[in-house]
């Protein structure tokens, strides 16, 4: 039996940090349902390279997960999502701060309705403070954190570390 067998995770994350975290939970035996936007899904579905028409990047981060397309602005889809929430143990999200609150699914609202639900969120600059609303792609985090100042050629411009270490570490901590 896997350590997280019987645990249901609703994964509203996208790109790398969040899907890395939910992928780890899936690897540990949780049932993970990835909730994606209709028509476009996770941005990484469009990231090359492609194998048999599918993004290898997306496939690697989302292996072992189930997927459902829901528009959380549409009443019918909200009803489906709320039925999933009633059964879920964990919900993960990595939207910019305030998005889940505007949808009516922020921590306070979910905690009131589903007090046993574990709510995990990751954002580049936190959920409060002067930079909370800024996007934080890995290159931005590497630059702001200073790691790019110690890479590359001496006397040359800063260079991004090849691996997306900021996103991977954020995903590890979200797990």
Where would I find each of the regions flagged by the language model?
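N-terminal helix-loop segment corresponding to the beta1-alpha1 unit
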Residues: 1-175
């Amino acid at each position: 039996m896997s350590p997280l067998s019987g645990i249901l995770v609703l994964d509203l994350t996208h790109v790398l940090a969040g899907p890395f975290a939910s992928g780890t939970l899936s690897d540990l035996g949780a049932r993970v349902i990835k909730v994606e936007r209709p028509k476009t899904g996770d941005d990484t579905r469009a990231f090359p390279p492609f194998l048999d028409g599918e993004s290898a990047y997306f496939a690697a981060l989302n292996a072992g997960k189930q997927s459902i397309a829901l528009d959380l602005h549409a009443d019918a889809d909200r009803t489906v999502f709320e039925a999933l929430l009633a059964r879920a143990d964990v919900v993960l999200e990595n939207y910019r701060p305030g998005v889940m609150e505007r949808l009516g699914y922020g921590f306070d609202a979910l905690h009131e309705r589903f007090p046993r639900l574990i709510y995990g969120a990751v954002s580049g600059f936190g959920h409060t403070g002067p930079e909370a609303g800024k996007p934080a792609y890995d290159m931005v985090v590497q630059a702001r954190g200073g790691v790019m100042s110690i890479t590359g050629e001496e006397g040359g411009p800063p260079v991004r570390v090849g691996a997306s270490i900021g996103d991977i570490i954020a995903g590890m901590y979200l797990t």
